[in-house]
Regions:
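A short, hydrophobic C-terminal helix/tail in secreted or cell-surface proteins
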Residues: 483-501
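Bacterial N-terminal signal peptides that target proteins for export
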Residues: 2-10, 486, 504
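C-terminal membrane-anchoring or membrane-association module
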Residues: 498-515
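C-terminal PAP-associated
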Residues: 25-480
Length: 547
């Protein structure tokens, strides 16, 4: 080999040292069937497997205690306060999600009022759990230091609604986010047209003294649910996403426009109300299949997701990194072929503005996608969850990631696949329209992310059979970063290359792999036999050429 060839190989050594980070994927735990991992006595006594209602995972939400990440709460539509002499049921784990308990620990805020109609939860940095609950079309906020205790729960104002008087009896879909001592609760107000608002407490939920629109006020014509979602950063900002729509000639199909807004003063004013007539930055617009109301779809005739889930909470999600230097939104719209897909748009601050840096499609072509969720880990990596339904008749729950600030998707794992029940099988009702609910949810603490979704149970052992139930599932994950390569290993590899090239010069095209990245790189996916973690990394299959 000529000396110039040796230098060329040695010049690659620095790149070989840093290459593993670029090839990192995700390590995701096998999903845990929450109902399937309850104590047998609880499963039996509560009738999880014998009741007509089997939709225990409908609209799941997750909160993890940052002071002890073994403590995990998952909520869903399981037992409400009218079906128990105690509180409404949440699922609680104290061993990082390996096993679960049913805790009837969320009391009604007002005697005689049934909850929940909707609810979302979040932990403070001090380990206090906050929750916002919809009951009687009003919004309530409460907190507890012990999610397993009914007596430990307390509500703002002793059970006083926190939504405005004008919206009383017409509020919907509360969404919670925390920031220091602030508690933000976004909600929809249907008392006059369609409005999106935010209620704010500046004293850890003791009182709510701010309640303002997150845009320029009610929209006179809106044929979709706004899907109002919020997220906060550590720089004092709160961000919102919502959608507005107008009907097309096809029922359940709308022209939808999505908006992003930001408040830098705790929800008092919103920075981009002047950016559009509605108020907020226009993220994008397109045709979207959701909310089949005019005329209403039925179980026998519909265009619902997977034929069992009308999307009545829009197709939206939002997250930001801690510093507010990157804001990410997920939206749903059709591609050029008429397939409903999930899109990821990334924004960065530029002066006082937010500027879109990229927008990409996340979900695969030819498969309808819905129920997106997103989080940003402390290392800046973006993690996305979404569901698809295709010609195979199965729902596929995907976990994808981006390590270049949303410019591309680096990995996409098919975390769970199942065949949905019919709605009548899941709910015992011939008029129900949602088997999975309005959302899935992702969150992260440090560089670990946690997620929940509704799916067909997969446990049939020890007297517990969940294979005919729709259950909440739990999973967690982190980065699959290969161990650092030492310089000695690199030099050993180079020596081997030199030796092989001397033995067989015509093998150079085999030994000198391509430097190509991006679309030419496929993924390798396997599940570790001991931990049952899904591991995925890129697999270079591009033609071998000299770099």
């Amino acid at each position: 080999m000529k000396p110039t060839h040796v230098l060329r190989l040695l010049a690659l050594a620095p790149g070989m040292l840093v290459a593993p980070a670029a090839f990192a994927g995700l390590i995701v735990s096998a999903p845990v069937d929450v109902i399937g991992n309850l104590p047998l006595a609880t499963f039996t006594s509560r009738g999880y497997g014998t009741r007509t209602y089997k939709d225990w995972g409908n609209e799941p939400y997750i909160a993890v205690n940052p002071l002890n990440t073994n403590d995990i709460l998952i909520s869903s539509f399981s037992f409400n306060t009218s079906s128990t002499t105690m509180g409404a049921n949440v699922f609680y784990s104290t061993d990082a999600g390996s096993s679960w308990t049913s805790q009837f620990s969320v009391p009604t805020p007002v005697n005689g009022l049934t909850i929940p109609n909707d609810w979302t939860f979040a932990y403070t940095s001090a380990g206090t759990l906050h929750g916002t609950v919809l009951g009687g079309n009003n919004i309530f906020q409460g907190a507890t230091t012990d999610p397993a205790s009914l007596a430990a729960w307390s509500y703002t104002g002793g059970g006083t609604r926190i939504n405005t008087a004008a919206s009383s009896g017409n509020a919907d879909q509360p969404w919670i986010a925390l920031q220091g001592g602030r508690v933000f609760v976004a909600y929809d107000d249907f008392h006059f047209n369609t409005a999106e608002r935010i209620a704010v407490s500046t004293n850890n939920g003791t009182s709510f003294t701010i309640d303002n629109p997150i845009n320029n006020g009610p929209q006179a014509v809106n044929t979709v649910n706004p899907g109002t979602r919020i997220a906060t950063d550590n720089a004092g900002n709160v961000y919102s996403i919502f959608g507005t729509g107008s009907a097309t000639a096809t029922r359940g199909v709308h022209n939808v426009t999505y908006y992003l807004n930001r408040s830098s003063d705790g929800g008092v004013t919103w920075d981009f109300n002047g950016s559009s007539v509605v108020g907020g930055i226009v993220i994008d617009s397109g045709v979207s299949t959701q909310l089949c109301n005019m005329p209403a779809c039925t179980q026998a005739s519909n265009n619902w997701f997977a034929n069992v889930n009308d999307l009545r909470g829009n197709i939206t999600s939002i997250a930001t990194d801690k510093t507010g230097s990157h804001v990410y939104v997920l939206i749903g719209k059709q591609d050029a072929n008429g397939t409903d897909r999930i899109y990821l748009a990334a924004y960065q601050p530029l002066g006082t503005n937010l500027v879109k840096s990229s927008e990409i499609v996340v979900s695969p072509a030819g498969e309808r996608a819905a129920l997106p969720a997103i989080t940003v880990k402390d290392d800046g990596r973006v993690v996305v969850m979404y569901e698809t339904y295709g010609a195979d008749g199965n729902v596929h729950v995907h976990v994808a990631s981006s390590d270049d600030f949303g410019a591309s998707i680096g990995s996409d794992i098919d975390e769970y696949t199942f065949t949905p029940l019919t709605l009548a099988q899941a709910t015992g009702s011939t008029t129900s329209n949602r088997e999975f609910g309005d959302y899935d949810f992702l969150m992260s603490i440090g560089d670990t992310f946690y997620g929940t979704f509704a799916g067909l149970g997969n446990v049939n052992a020890g007297g517990i059979d969940t294979t005919r139930l729709i259950d909440p599932f739990f999973f967690s994950g982190t980065d699959a970063v290969p161990e650092p390569r030492s310089l000695s290993l690199v030099l050993t590899g180079l020596a081997a290359v030199l030796w092989l090239r001397r033995r067989k010069k015509n093998m150079s095209e085999v030994l000198c792999r391509s430097c190509a990245t991006g679309a030419g790189r496929k993924r390798r996916r396997w599940r570790d036999g001991r931990s049952q973690r899904v591991i995925e990394r890129p697999l270079d299959t591009t033609p071998a050429t000299w770099c």
